[in-house]
């Protein structure tokens, strides 16, 4: 009996050994088993992982099956021209490698669009798989990236035609022209045209690309290529996809970053956030769950409770099962594009809260937008857009103005993000506007990196600017003046300078301080409404501050006669007005320049002419003698009422404010010809004939033209007028000396009197007091040479003993 028992045990052991051997052979013979299957998933819920991987894995073939598959597959060699084009695409047309994922998702979206369209007329089109999704999965262990869609799929013929052939008619001519354009440094975007070759961007990051596809009208096939040749064969596993396509990339070593979940998620959000179909990424998250304790853990815990003197005894029936909190990694599909493109809906159907929520999500801002506009543009190019004005100006708005690219306008084509790297989508002065532009028919070049036809971009730009200005115009006056103008007023002024075609529209948005109100700002429309009956010009005065502008001698008579004067207090203001020739048929008049005239009666005209004749000796004396090289001419002023004189620029010269701004420029070197020309223009010296100083000067000049006091007075008046008119003095020391001389004369002090010399100080006696006391000398001698050296080095003051 014992012998039979031993024999039976041996048989069982032998049988078990054969079974294990068979299992080991089967495992060893499998190469690339479960290609694409993530090992992270297998460490968690096996059933979930198996179910999900069945829909996304490429194959589960063993080594012999893979060898047979590759031996029986039909191989195709890329033609020389196609191979050349492939290299051109990989090396030349794509500016950055990360766009490969955008292209693959875009192709997947196109395939989903096609099957959805087919399903409208064919009720069985979605029978194989009713889902319409894109799924992305990373397999770091096997260096694989999978992109699966449930779109229309491809037949064998379509795999060969669509993925194996890029060549079109005239390919050689196309390549030659492109090569010539590159050698000449010209743009190739016009030559490229619209090729459907975004798929080949996969070779930017992959050594090998494997495509498994199932079409409703054909069996499932596998397409494989290393960019040199490709092969196609029927999938021996049969129909594992149901319908759709899986693209598997065997990534290059330097492209391993694209296996990181964060990298893939960021790329999906960046480029494909608004795709119409849901995009999922197989990702993990850590959850804290409670699990029952094992028996040994429970026993240990009960022992610890028993040993604890402070433990509270619990009744048997109240005891609950022992559990512990455990952190567990859970894998599942995470939706990436949960933000819907609200610009695709009619504006009437979108609530205000939806616009605000979209703006905050889109711009990463916490505040609501100040204004927004949602519109559809039709014509030469059709697109939909939503534009926003932020509540506050972005930080560094004018840093590198004009050279810094604006990334606030994002361009989409069929909800696929193309670029926000623009120099010319919006003009520089509107660099604060944020928004999206989405077009279904915008032509792109092969790499989607640059717009194919720049004229269409100009059409889009033109419409965006018009809509933006309409949006700004509709902002309520109170909000506009209190908020918008403080944040973006400088932008509007720059727009007047830069945008000639929209200058009239922008002029209506301008706001300035004026003499009409001490604090409120005014528009040009409001100024024109308040103009006097026969006033034909808009008067303005520029200064570094309102106080300087309104205290200028140039505005004295204007304010006295009731004319409103606009105050320009910002450095850009005078440039802005100079670029604006007129507004509503009214020309602008700088009151610091020539040309200010008032309506006068015949009697007033006769009085003015008589005054000019009376002061003709003084005017000629100033022009030909006292101020000979300093002024263009001297005239009797019509604009002064309180000040004795003023220095007026010519129509084409610089005002004092403009000269100060130009000389303060960091790049000003003094070598610019035009700058030197404007700066060297002589001014007109206007005098007030009713001022006592001027009348007394006339009397003195008539008595003695060579009177030195009058000569000094004329120069001092000129230099004072230079300062009050906003100009800088070339020699401030000479001006100070003349003022001092005038003060001496007014106090009856001799102009030649010298400053009293300071009394010379007597040199201090450095010798030490000595006495005849022999005992003191003896004590000092006994102090030793060492103490004397110390006293000499420290230069101590004589002690009380020494003084005695």
UniProtKB/Swiss-Prot annotation:
User: What GO cellular component is one of the record's annotations?
Assistant: cytosol
Gene3D superfamilies named in the record = 3.30.230.80, 3.40.50.11260, Heat shock protein 90, C-terminal domain (1.20.120.790), Histidine kinase-like ATPase, C-terminal domain (3.30.565.10)
| Residues annotated as site: Important for ATP hydrolysis | 448
| Sites of N6-succinyllysine modification | 404, 633
The Acidic residues compositionally biased stretches are 289-317, 753-794
UniProt keywords (A-Z) are: Acetylation, ATP-binding, Calcium, Chaperone, Disulfide bond, Endoplasmic reticulum, Glycoprotein, Hydrolase, Hydroxylation, Nucleotide-binding, Phosphoprotein, Sarcoplasmic reticulum, Signal
Q: Motif SRT pseudosubstrate motif: which ranges?
A: 42-44
User: What is its subcellular localisation?
Assistant: Endoplasmic reticulum lumen; Sarcoplasmic reticulum lumen; Melanosome
Q: Where is the composition biased (Basic and acidic residues)?
A: 795-804
Q: What does the record's free text say on domains? A: The SRT pseudosubstrate motif associates with STT3A during translation in normal conditions, preventing glycosylation of facultative sites until HSP90B1 folding is completed.
**Complex formation:** Homodimer; disulfide-linked. Component of an EIF2 complex at least composed of CELF1/CUGBP1, CALR, CALR3, EIF2S1, EIF2S2, HSP90B1 and HSPA5. Part of a large chaperone multiprotein complex comprising DNAJB11, HSP90B1, HSPA5, HYOU, PDIA2, PDIA4, PDIA6, PPIB, SDF2L1, UGGT1 and very small amounts of ERP29, but not, or at very low levels, CALR nor CANX. Interacts with AIMP1; regulates its retention in the endoplasmic reticulum. Hyperglycosylated form interacts with OS9; promoting its degradation by the endoplasmic reticulum associated degradation (ERAD). Interacts with CNPY3.
Q: Which family does it belong to?
A: Belongs to the heat shock protein 90 family.
Q: What is this protein called?
A: Endoplasmin
Organism per entry: Rattus norvegicus (Rat)
